[in-house]
Amino acid sequence: MATLLLLRSLRLHRSLRPRTRPAVDVPLRAGSHGARLLYPDHIPTTPLQKMLLAAGAAGMALYNPYRHDMVAVLGETTGCHTLKFLRDQMKKDPEGAQILQERPRISLSTLDLSKLQSLPEGSLGREYLRFLDVNKVSPDTRAPTRFVDDEELAYVIQRYREVHDMLHTLLGMPTNMLGEVVVKWFEAVQTGLPMCILGALFGPIRLRTQSLQVLFSELIPWAIQNGRRAPCVLNIYYEQRWEQPLTALREELGISPPPKHIQGLA
């Protein structure tokens, strides 16, 4: 309850300021050096406010893992040092550095759905579109970054959110609870973000016994192995690889095919 009250007060405080909201997705960049609002949805917070938000968001996310707003708040208020490490990894990689420079966004306003639909069967773009259709999800459900007090790091965590469904596609995981837990294990190994580690450790609490057996005996070892073997997935410019066969991209990244029986579990 305290977290929700704090969120509401921060939103109210922000709403009293003049604001210009972009009509479409734009790269996250600072408007000027020294400006307190560093990007369009930025809400400056003190260390104490971040601590309170993190504690409350963690509790809410554990109680209801589908509260994506609370998961987002938890990620932004606990991952500063990890985000710096991920940012530095991107800067050292040519493809990652290009992403940081160009700041691409993944949303319905930036995706050419008709082009994706026209791509060959088995291509990354076609399989990503199939994932969205089958699981009835939209890239527009990703919350904007608000509580990261650095515009470059804000983009890094925004990029992580927007490629989350791409990781589902790469790993062949559905959006049920079991699939989400498996992806969280992969992300935890890949990124080290506290919210990913928390989701990986506590997500299994809500799974059935049959799913738990498969998770611990097969899926967690598979996710950890792939997470360690693959290069940083934030360094992949997915939008420039739509035509690449999904199997070829998996092979390039060292990601082995997903277990066949995952779809029947929840």
Swiss-Prot record:
Lineage, highest ranks first? Eukaryota, Metazoa, Chordata, Craniata, Vertebrata
Any GO BP annotation: ubiquinone biosynthetic process
Share what the entry says about its subunit structure, partners included.
Component of a multi-subunit COQ enzyme complex, composed of at least COQ3, COQ4, COQ5, COQ6, COQ7 and COQ9.
Q: Where does it primarily localize?
A: mitochondrion
User: According to its record, what are the GO cellular component terms?
Assistant: extrinsic component of mitochondrial inner membrane; mitochondrial inner membrane; mitochondrial matrix; mitochondrion; ubiquinone biosynthesis complex
Where, in this chain's numbering, is Zn(2+) bound? 164-165, 168, 180
Reactions performed catalytically: 4-hydroxy-3-methoxy-5-(all-trans-decaprenyl)benzoate + H(+) = 2-methoxy-6-(all-trans-decaprenyl)phenol + CO2
State the top-level EC class: lyase
Q: Name the species this protein comes from.
A: Mus musculus (Mouse)
Q: What does the similarity note say?
A: Belongs to the COQ4 family.
Pathway connected to this protein: Cofactor biosynthesis; ubiquinone biosynthesis
State the function annotated in the UniProt record: Lyase that catalyzes the C1-decarboxylation of 4-hydroxy-3-methoxy-5-(all-trans-decaprenyl)benzoic acid into 2-methoxy-6-(all-trans-decaprenyl)phenol during ubiquinone biosynthesis.
Q: What is the top-level taxon of the source organism?
A: Eukaryota
The GO terms describing molecular function are:
4-hydroxy-3-methoxy-5-polyprenylbenzoate decarboxylase activity; carboxy-lyase activity
Protein name listed in UniProt: Ubiquinone biosynthesis protein COQ4 homolog, mitochondrial
The record's listing under InterPro entries reads: Coq4 (IPR007715), Coq4_euk (IPR027540)
Gene that encodes the chain = Coq4
CC cofactor: Zn(2+)
The disulfide bonds in this chain are none
Q: How does it sit in the membrane?
A: Peripheral membrane protein
